[in-house]
Amino acid sequence: MLELLKKIGYTLYRIWFYILVALPILVFFPFLLLTTFSEKWYPAFFWLARNLWAKPILYGMGCPPKIVYEEKMERGKSYMLVANHTSMLDIMLMLYISKNPFVFVGKKELVKIPLFGFFYKRVCIMVDREDTKSRTAVYRRAQRRLNQGLSICIFPEGGVPDDESVVLDHFKDGAFKMAIAHDIPVVPMTFIDNKKRFSFTFFSGSPGPLRAKVHSFFDTTDLDGEGTAELREKVRAVILAELLAEQ
C-alpha cells in the first residue's frame, strides 16, 4: 500500500511539473513569440524565460535554488557555461544562475517536445551529433551569437547517462573547442541536487533545495586547439570532485 501511495505521489509531482512548464508559455505566448522574430530581441526573450518561466518552475516545484559563487560573471561579457546534466531542472537552474543572456546548444531531438520544442527551435542552437555539417554550422551560429554579446551554454556530457549510478560521464570536446576558438572563459558549474530532486526516472523526485556551485573560471586566451583535451579534463575534474564531496 505504501509503495502504491509513493507511486501516486511521484506521478502527481511529475504532472505538476509539466503544468508549471506549460502554463507560463501559454499565458505569455504572444510576448514570447514576438521576441523570437529577431535575434536582436533575444535578450528580452531571455528575460521572460528566466523570470517568468524558470523561476516559477523551480519555486513551484518546492526546489528553491541555493547557489555558491567562487567567481561571478561580469555583465556584458561572453562566457562558455558548462555543467553536469542529470535532470530536466538543469535548464531552469542554468537560467536562474546566469543573469547574462546565453544561448543553449542542444540536441535537435528536443524540438519534438510539445510547446517547449516550438521555442527551442527558434532560439537555441540545435546540433545533430551524427551529422558533421551540423556540427560545423553550430560553430558559425555560435560565433554570430557571441558577436552579439551573448554567452553559450553546453552540457558537455552530450546527454544524460541511462545508468543513473554514473556520477559524471565523460565530456565531449565541443564546448571547449568553441571556448578556445572564441577566447571566452569557461564557467564550470556543479548541480548537486538536481538528480535527487527530479531525475529522468519517472517514479522519483522530491521537493527540497537545489544546491549548485559556480566554480572559478578557466581562461582560454593563451590556449590553442592542442589544449582542448587538457582543458576538458581539468573542468571535468573540478565538477566531479564537487559531486563526490557531496555524496
Language model features with spans:
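N-terminal membrane-anchoring alpha-helices
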Residues: 1-64
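Non-catalytic C-terminal accessory region of glycerolipid acyltransferases
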Residues: 4-8, 137-247
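Catalytic core of membrane glycerolipid acyltransferases/transacylases, capturing the structured
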Residues: 28-48, 58-61, 74-132
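A generic structural signal for well-ordered alpha-helical segments
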Residues: 57-58, 120, 145, 179
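Short gly/ser/thr-rich secondary-structure transition/capping motifs
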Residues: 61-68, 135-136, 194-197
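Short acidic-hydrophobic, aromatic-tinged amphipathic segments that line or gate anion-handling sites
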Residues: 67, 125-128, 220
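Generic preference for hydrophobic
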Residues: 67, 81, 104, 154, ...
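A short beta-turn/loop motif at secondary-structure boundaries
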Residues: 71-75, 204-205
